[in-house]
């Protein structure tokens, strides 16, 4: 009985409060659990194919010999544009090799729950007068047309309104520049930056110091000076240190270059604005030409819409799932050893001309004897990692006060770049899954 007493004494007292608390836990256990998020799937770059090049101890012997007059390595936008250029020049035998299973590179798209979405680049700004080749192609595919001497864009493919908004101080505001009091120091600094951008856009010679493509603008000592200092340093020396302005300029650099204002050059930071739509402080109105150039083409699948139209003329001449292993320049030709992922065999291509439309660090690795210029350029270039995540929502997001849902939605202070609603271009009048 002694042991029995000891056991009885060891039992905890069960008060009413403890009973109520434990009952609550039991009832909570009976509540329906939130469904787990569906597992994520990786549909990006086929990294294991690239690792085949990195990890190979020796190159496999070719099982097949193939020939082409022109061989383009890489079917991203650069490779597709190069192939188009050769075709327009009358070269019929243009072949393309692409590591992925679809052309487009950083402009590929995807389908999620039956809805198209981008895997990378998702818009194209209306080209300026210097981008003649881009404008000509957009005319060819019907995105641009000439009316009474003016270039007019097909509004069906322009980003629908509202285009962008920013989340700041607990509410959404129109545009991407945080709203400020026009009489504040923030507004004064924004006007000062706007004036500086305008001066670079309209030099004494009457021409802009910046343009797209950049090589069509003459390089000079002033631009070289901008290129030797960071954008942040250039802003600091001019007293442009307002938190709202600096956040926006930093966001613009991260969005376009993958690096912050304290890393990119002042030339790059100013180029973002001066080569296109400029910078407009609160209360400043854009001119008619600037308003037109602020428009962007976009589609649910992003720039995959464009990539598909660039790739369409090549059809059977576009060889996807081909990993380039080696490029060797001979006296009379160039040989390219590639691994065909579908056939699981190595293939040797021989061409008169080879275009390396590849990232520089890959080009420097696959070329048998890379020239000094390629090695130096690859060593100097830094790459910034980035990730595009597509989420399927059963219904529209619960919205907060302020500006209505837009195509581009950015959060002040976030390390990310915001989110784009791929279904913003939908003509369905009733909001739904996105």
Task: Kindly label every feature range from the protein language model.
Residues 79:
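N-terminal Rossmann-fold NAD(P) dinucleotide-binding loop
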Residues 114-202:
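Dinucleotide-binding Rossmann-like beta1-alpha1 core, especially the glycine-rich loop
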Residues 87-110:
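Glycine-rich FAD pyrophosphate-binding loop
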Residues 205-326, 331-333:
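Active-site/ligand-binding neighborhood in enzyme catalytic cores
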């Amino acid at each position: 009985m002694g042991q029995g007493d000891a056991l009885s004494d060891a039992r905890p007292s069960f008060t009413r409060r403890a009973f109520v608390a434990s009952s609550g836990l039991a009832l909570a256990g009976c509540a329906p659990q939130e469904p787990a998020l569906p597992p994520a799937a990786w549909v990006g770059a086929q990294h294991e194919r690239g690792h085949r090049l990195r990890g190979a101890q020796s190159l496999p012997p070719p099982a097949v010999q193939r020939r082409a007059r022109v061989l383009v390595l890489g079917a991203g936008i650069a490779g597709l544009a190069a192939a188009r250029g050769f075709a327009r020049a009358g070269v019929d035998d243009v072949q393309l090799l692409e590591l992925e299973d679809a052309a487009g590179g950083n402009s590929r798209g995807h389908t999620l729950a039956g809805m198209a979405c981008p895997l990378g680049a998702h818009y194209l700004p209306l080209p300026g007068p210097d981008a003649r080749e881009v404008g000509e192609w957009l005319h060819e595919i019907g995105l641009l047309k000439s009316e009474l001497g003016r270039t007019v864009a097909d509004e069906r493919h322009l980003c629908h309104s509202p285009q962008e908004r920013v989340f700041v101080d607990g509410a959404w505001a129109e545009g991407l520049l945080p709203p400020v009091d026009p009489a504040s120091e923030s507004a004064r600094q924004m006007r000062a930056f706007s004036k500086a951008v305008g001066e670079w856009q309209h030099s004494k010679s009457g021409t802009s110091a910046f343009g797209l493509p950049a090589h069509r603008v003459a390089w000079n000592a002033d631009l070289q000076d901008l290129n030797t200092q960071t954008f942040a340093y250039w802003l600091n020396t001019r007293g442009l240190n307002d938190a709202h302005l600096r956040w926006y300029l930093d966001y613009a650099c991260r969005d376009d270059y993958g690096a912050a204002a304290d890393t990119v050059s002042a030339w790059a930071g100013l180029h973002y604005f001066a080569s296109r739509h400029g910078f407009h402080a609160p209360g400043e109105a854009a001119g008619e030409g600037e308003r037109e150039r602020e428009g962007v083409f976009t589609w649910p699948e992003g720039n995959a819409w464009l990539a598909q139209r660039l790739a369409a003329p090549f059809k059977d001449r576009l060889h996807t799932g081909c990993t380039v292993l080696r490029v060797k320049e001979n006296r009379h030709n160039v040989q390219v050893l590639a691994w065909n992922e579908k056939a699981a065999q190595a293939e040797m291509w021989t061409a008169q001309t080879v275009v390396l439309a590849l990232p520089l660090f890959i080009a420097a690795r696959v070329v048998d004897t890379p020239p000094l210029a390629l090695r130096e350029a690859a060593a100097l270039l830094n790459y910034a990692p980035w990730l595009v995540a597509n989420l399927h929502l059963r219904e529209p997001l619960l919205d907060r006060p302020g500006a209505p849902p837009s195509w581009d939605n950015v959060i002040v202070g976030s390390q990310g770049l915001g989110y784009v609603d791929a279904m913003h271009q939908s003509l369905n009048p009733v909001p739904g899954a996105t």
